[in-house]
């Protein structure tokens, strides 16, 4: 397809990033008309769509004003409605996600928020479009096929942070779009259930899906049951889940042989909680364990006696340990004294001092004589100390 995308990129750079609302809106109208005309004549190929999405990426990159960022994100998401064929709409979403994944490592922390918002607005536009089509299975499957190749995939080349962000906004945007039956919701979540059982995904992604998708569903159910018990009013509507079907799918995934024990335990924990939800019970309610046997007063008295005996044995062990340490130190001192006597290094009795130890006992150690302090020599010259007398270097007695 011979498309003059170079001229369109000039419009992106010069007009769409302009701070003047009139100029920006006029440029967007030109872009919309150009896409509509080109799409009616001949389909865009993937190369054209990738260049288009890259241009849109840098338009968002250059936009620094928050209000204009939100408006631009809505405009970019709304481009899905400009393409004439459903095939082009699906491929545009695919190219948008792939292009953003390539650029994601280069996004700094000051620009990250606006690109996270851009992803959300694109997903919102996509789900709104599907809701208008009553979530027809054949069309919905085409979009979910794209997601399974990008954001719900084991593909290492697709940015993992983008996969996490998509999982974190999925339930919110499905709820906002509305119009889904329980069966359709289960079909939308099935790729994520299968992904939990894939051994190739990282622990980071597994935990993200576990928390952002399935624990969120259970938390919503728990909050609903708590509100009903406390007589609070809850907003009607929102997506509904078939807890029994989701639990059954999780069980099939959990029994796969290649799963490690840690992940299998987490998946089976979800199975139990979804089963409780299907029976109308609070999945996150913790029940205090009740002992199987009832304890009598005699049992408590016996336990008290055993505790006293155990405490006394500990005291006896500590006492014996201190006695052994004392004997070892005494033998060490005797050995050192014998060695000094053999070498003729006897220490006079008047130079033996008694030092009180921490345990209250005293032991004899030799006194240490203090050396004579150094005296500063008067006058000029180098100081010397000979026998405690001060002398000047170069001066004779």
Curated annotation (Swiss-Prot):
Subcellular location: Nucleus
Taxonomy, superkingdom: Eukaryota
Main location: nucleus
InterPro entries for the chain: RRP1 (IPR010301)
The entry's keywords: Nucleus, rRNA processing
Pfam family, one: Nop52
Protein name stated in the entry: Ribosomal RNA processing protein 1 homolog
Naturally occurring in which organism (per UniProt): Caenorhabditis elegans
């Amino acid at each position: 397809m011979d498309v003059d995308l170079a001229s369109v990129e000039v419009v992106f750079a010069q007009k769409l990033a302009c701070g003047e609302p009139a100029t920006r809106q006029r440029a967007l109208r030109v872009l919309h008309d150009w896409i509509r005309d080109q799409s009616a004549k001949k389909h865009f190929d993937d190369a054209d769509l990738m260049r288009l999405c890259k241009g849109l990426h840098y338009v968002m990159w250059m936009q620094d004003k928050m209000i204009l960022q939100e408006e631009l994100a809505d405009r970019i998401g709304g481009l899905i409605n400009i393409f004439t064929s459903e095939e082009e709409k699906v491929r545009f979403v695919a190219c948008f996600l792939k292009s953003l994944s390539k650029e994601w490592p280069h996004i700094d922390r000051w620009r990250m928020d606006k690109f996270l918002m851009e992803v959300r607005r694109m997903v919102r536009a996509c789900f709104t479009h599907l809701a208008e089509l009553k979530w027809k299975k054949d069309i919905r499957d085409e979009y979910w096929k794209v997601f399974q190749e990008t954001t719900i995939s084991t593909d290492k080349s697709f940015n993992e942070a983008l996969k996490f962000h998509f999982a974190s906004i999925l339930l919110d945007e499905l709820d906002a779009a509305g119009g889904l039956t329980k069966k359709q919701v289960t079909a939308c979540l099935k790729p994520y259930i299968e992904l939990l059982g894939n051994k190739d995904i990282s622990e980071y992604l597994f935990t993200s899906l576990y928390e952002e998708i399935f624990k969120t569903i259970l938390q919503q159910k728990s909050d609903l049951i708590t509100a009903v018990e406390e007589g609070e009013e809850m907003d009607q509507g929102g997506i509904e889940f078939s807890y029994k079907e989701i639990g059954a799918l999780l069980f099939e995934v959990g029994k796969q042989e290649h799963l490690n024990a840690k992940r299998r335990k987490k998946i089976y924990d979800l199975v139990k909680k979804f089963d409780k939800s299907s029976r109308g019970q609070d999945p996150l309610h913790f029940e205090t364990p009740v002992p199987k046997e009832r304890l009598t007063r005699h049992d408590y008295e016996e336990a008290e006696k055993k505790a006293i005996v155990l405490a006394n044995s500990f005291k006896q062990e500590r006492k014996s340990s201190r006695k052994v340490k004392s004997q070892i130190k005494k033998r060490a001192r005797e050995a050192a004294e014998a060695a000094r006597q053999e070498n003729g290094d006897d220490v006079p009795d008047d130079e033996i001092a008694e030092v009180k130890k921490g345990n209250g006992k005293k032991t004899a150690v030799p006194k240490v004589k203090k050396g004579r302090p150094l005296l500063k020599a008067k006058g000029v010259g180098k100081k010397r100390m000979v026998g405690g007398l001060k002398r000047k270097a170069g001066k004779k007695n």
